Amino acid sequence: EPGQRWQWLIEHWQPYAVQTDQGQDQGLLTGYFEPELQLRRARDDAHQVPLYALPHGWQSGQRWHTRQVMDSDPALQQALADKVIAWAADPIEALVLQIQGSGRATITEPDGSQRRVRLAFAGHNGHPYRSIGRWLLDQGETRDGSWDGITAWVRAHPQRLQSLLWVNPRVVFFREEPLAPQAADIGPRGAQGVPLTPRRSVAVDPNSVPYGTALWLQTEGVALSGARMVVAQDTGGAIVGAVRAYFFTGWGQAAKDTEYQLKQRMRWWALLPRTVPLDQPTSTKGTGDG
């Protein structure tokens, strides 16, 4: 029963307020999800956007070619030909997949058969992520930097789509994994190495919040409201500091809608067993700006 669970929680776990080094206890909560794509194994007139596995010569932590170079260098494209997992029709959908880090796909093979897969994060080209929505806002091109606003801008300026995509130099590489029916309710593996749970898993800065930490999250907004227990199981390139998180919303249309709306203030408390002593029990501080 909910009352019994709450009683067990307060009897066995001690909350410690999480703060930045500057003493700030409020930060930003955004979301991420697993997008769903329809892909083709073979390139055709409608499917022209490649999704790559790790390329030859790639090394973690080293910078590789930018998105613009990969899109415009014929010799490099030829060298990458055997690393194309599948082809997408919509460049924006492909970019969303890369930003989210993983996704689910139905791949149509050349013989017409279809394969259900997960495209799991394998690595990236070492360049920093740059938001195309923020760039459009900074350039005065739009007043709406959301994905709906970006899509509307692209429809109005299709001839400028490629240059917009090149604003973000980062390219994410994937690993194809079979997605059996019995695994349909299991999330992708996060940085901790365990499958993510919708609305319970969060991505954090592991330098501030260790993986596996249970946290009591409080937030109020249109997309998410109230308090709940979450677990730090993943990370993201834009997450810096102790009071900053991505909330895993899951997969499907409802998860997508929540992710697109989720940008609000948050506070949270690290939940530690009452039997664990702490030298400084007042707060858990990180290194970021919150």
Residue ranges of predicted features:
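Solvent-exposed, well-ordered loop and adjacent helix/strand elements within mature globular domains
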Residues: E1-G290
